[in-house]
Curated annotation (Swiss-Prot):
Residues 116-127 have a biased composition (Low complexity). This is Pre-mRNA-splicing factor CEF1. Associated with the spliceosome. Residues 290-299 have a biased composition (Polar residues). GO terms for cellular component: cytoplasm; Prp19 complex; U2-type catalytic step 1 spliceosome. SMART domains: SANT.
Length: 541
């Protein structure tokens, strides 16, 4: 015959609710398997749901308001089938939110169909189609069944076992457990005190480790709690660890020999010589006491703490013979006499020297005159070239010229606009009236001079002037040709310069930093490789 199948579940009884409350009060809300062992017909998951959905005193079981209904419908629309999240936002159990949502749906459907609205109880009953003997899927959120007049044998046995286990918090057994716990604590404190006394005597002992109640229990008597060992790094620090370990052992040995306070005082004396010298200085009270007992032949006068005696040389003249000089003239005579004696003691001069005259400045003067003549000739030629007509060359790009100010507000902006217009039209800048008057006067004088010269009938003069003008025109054409050649060369060189500048910028800004970073990575990896090879050789040996 097959064994019977026991299904854990169904509606909760009043006795089961009382046992669950008492178990949560003792074991807390994390040990549900231990709590479920007290209940024969329920498992750990069902106990947890029953507590979180129904028995928890912090839950809100009041009726829903209109604002809460509106909020519930909005949350269901935004978070479909996420009842845990909706219950947290509403501050109510998830099953209560589901039931309220079903009620709202049924009322809306009944209104659309034209049926009469039913009450809340009938809505709840009709929302689930269950038969009386079937197991309720949300039994943990339903009300508990009332107790019968007489309990069954299973319930009576379950209640007696729960009483035996849960009533340890009161009575003789509870006091005995508290007494045992206090005894263990006093034993532990006595062991720690004994260990401290033995350590001061130079005997190192270790405490007996108590049995752990659970696997991850922390022993706070250990040296380091929650110690995190640093990971192995690129550099070898074994020698540094050995040095620190040795220094720690020396420190502990000195503490064990001399004690902490004495060792601290010795360290302070060794580390602070200034404090040592300050300690050696006598206090004011000591000075008063010693000054009363000092005599003329006392050894305290020759004490090392005193400053050494100042030994001065004997004076050259007595203080009685010294007097302030009244006549400054006698002092000047004495100084003069002293200087003559010093000069007479010097050796006689040999006079072995020759006077070298500097070169004459005639050549320099001639060079200066020739430079002045050349400058005057250049000035005259430039003036003549300025008067002659010339072809204009657009060396400067028109895009480089700035724009004109639309509404000039002061004299500076008006002058600025004039200069820009002159630059665009390649016209000469405007000259003031005073300068124009001077220019007209000079021009009239030059015209008179030229007319006087042309009135002469000497053919040689006319030929010479004609030849000079031809030469000047030839030179002007030659310079114009050279300027045009330079302009063409500039147009060729300018893109090359820009390209070169762009290449230099890319090299400096991107390539050189990238090269440095790659070089650094290479050196670090090469260093790591060498270290690994070295350790591999050591291990193989």
């Amino acid at each position: 015959m097959a064994p019977p199948i026991y299904v854990r579940g169904g509606l909760w009884t009043n006795i089961e609710d009382q046992i669950l409350k008492a178990a949560v009060q003792k074991y807390g809300v994390h040990q549900w398997s231990k709590i479920a062992s007290l209940l024969q017909k329920k498992n750990a998951r069902q106990c947890e749901i029953r507590w979180n959905e129904y028995l928890n005193p912090t839950l809100n079981f009041e009726e829903f308001t209109k604002e809460e209904d509106k909020k519930l419908l909005e949350l269901v629309r935004t978070l479909p089938n996420q009842w845990r999240t909706i219950s947290e936002l509403m501050g109510r159990p998830s099953q209560q939110c589901i039931e309220r949502y079903n009620i709202l749906l049924e009322t809306e459907l009944s209104k659309t169909d034209g049926e009469a609205t039913t009450s809340a109880n009938s809505a709840i009953s009709t929302s689930f189609g269950f038969k009386p003997n079937e197991i309720h899927p949300s039994a943990e959120t339903q009300k508990a069944k009332p107790d019968n007049d007489e309990l069954d044998e299973d319930e009576r046995e379950m209640l007696s076992e729960a009483r035996a286990r849960l009533l340890n918090t009161q009575g003789k057994k509870a006091t005995r457990k508290v007494r045992e716990r206090m005894l263990e604590e006093s034993k532990r404190i006595a062991q720690i005190q004994k260990r401290r006394e033995l350590k001061q005597a130079g005997i190192n002992t270790s405490l007996k480790k108590s049995k752990k109640k659970y696997e991850n229990e922390i022993d706070y008597n250990a040296d380091v709690v929650y110690e995190i060992v640093p990971p192995a790094v690129l550099y070898d620090v074994t020698r540094e660890n050995e040095r620190t370990q040795k220094a720690l052992q020396d420190f502990e040995r000195n503490i064990a020999k001399k004690g902490k306070r004495k060792f601290k005082d010795d360290g302070e004396k060794e580390s602070s010589p200034r404090k040592r010298s300050r300690d050696k200085r006598p206090n004011k009270e000591d000075n008063k006491e010693t000054s009363m007992s000092i005599t003329s032949n006392d050894s305290v006068l020759l004490n090392d703490m005193k400053k050494p005696v100042l030994n001065l040389s004997a004076p050259r003249a007595d203080g009685e013979n010294l007097s302030v000089s009244s006549n400054n003239t006698n002092d000047a005579v004495l100084v003069k006499k002293y200087l003559t004696e010093c000069f007479s003691a010097l050796p006689t001069p040999k006079n072995d020297f020759e006077i070298l005259w500097e070169d004459s400045d005639d050549d320099d003067e001639q060079e200066i005159v020739s430079e002045e003549d050349d400058n005057s000739i250049k000035v005259q030629e430039s003036e003549q070239l300025y008067e002659l007509p010339m072809e204009t060359f657009d060396i400067v790009d028109s895009s480089m010229i700035p724009s004109i100010i639309a509404d000039p507000k002061n004299e500076f902006e008006e002058e600025y606009n004039k200069l820009i217009k002159d630059a665009r039209t390649r016209a000469k800048p405007t000259i003031s009236k005073e300068h124009l008057q001077i220019w007209d006067d000079l021009n009239e004088e030059i015209q008179k001079d030229i007319s006087g010269r042309t009135s002469l009938t000497n053919p040689e003069v006319q030929i010479s002037t004609d030849t000079n003008l031809d030469e000047l025109r030839a030179q002007i054409q030659k310079y114009q040709q050279r300027i045009s050649n330079y302009d063409e060369q500039l147009h060729i060189i300018k893109p090359l310069v820009e390209n070169n500048e762009q290449i230099c910028n890319t090299i400096i800004r991107s390539l050189i930093p990238e090269l440095k970073s790659k070089q650094l990575k290479y050196y670090t990896r090469y260093y790591m490789f060498m270290k690994e090879q070295k350790h591999i050789k050591k291990r193989t040996k």
